[in-house]
């Protein structure tokens, strides 16, 4: 521990030696240059992002699948109307077209 303290004190005394202004300026400028060089963006090809030659195709939409429960429910409903006479008649009554001609009233332009 004492050796460590002695070396630190020696470094302080070395740093405290009076220097000429030119030497200090030169050392400061060299430190600044080193700092600037270490802060530069790397420009080598290893550090660059590679260019994309062709764009990938867009993702395709997946076809919608009806779940099995919906399929079975639909098929059961259809079988009911096909199997019974009452069911088929009921369906026909829903879609029977009765010819009731509805006359639309025309507006008169005279007011």
Swiss-Prot record:
GO cellular component annotations, sorted alphabetically?
A: nucleus
Describe its function.
Cyclin-dependent protein kinase (CDK) inhibitor that restricts cell proliferation and cooperates with SIM and SMR1 to promote endoreplication during leaf development.
Provide the alphabetized UniProt keywords: Cell cycle, Nucleus, Protein kinase inhibitor
Cite the residue spans of the region called Disordered: 1-66
Q: Which InterPro entries match?
A: SMR (IPR040389)
Compositionally biased tracts (Basic and acidic residues): 10-35
Spell out the protein name for this chain.
Answer: Cyclin-dependent protein kinase inhibitor SMR2
The molecular function GO annotations come to: protein kinase inhibitor activity
Q: Does the keyword Cell cycle apply?
A: yes
Which tissues is it found in, per the record? Expressed at low levels in roots and stems. Expressed in the root vascular tissue.
A GO biological-process term: regulation of DNA endoreduplication
Q: Which organism is it from?
A: Arabidopsis thaliana
Disruption-associated phenotype: Larger leaves with an increased cell number.
Look up keyword RNA-binding and say if it applies.
Answer: no
What is the first-listed, main subcellular location in coarse terms?
A: nucleus
| Oligomeric form and interacting partners | Interacts with CYCD2-1. Interacts with CDKB1-1.
Q: Could you tell me where this protein is found in the cell?
A: Nucleus
């Amino acid at each position: 521990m004492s050796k460590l303290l002695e070396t630190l004190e020696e470094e302080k005394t070395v740093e405290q030696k009076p220097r000429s202004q030119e030497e200090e300026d030169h050392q400061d400028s060299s430190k600044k240059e080193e700092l600037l060089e270490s802060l530069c963006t790397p420009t080598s090809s290893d550090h660059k992002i590679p260019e994309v030659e062709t764009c990938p195709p867009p993702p395709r939409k997946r076809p919608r699948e009806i779940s099995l429960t919906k399929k079975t429910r639909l098929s059961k409903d259809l079988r009911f109307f096909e199997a019974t006479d009452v069911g088929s008649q009921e369906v026909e009554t829903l879609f029977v077209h009765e010819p009731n001609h509805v006359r639309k009233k025309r507006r008169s332009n005279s007011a």
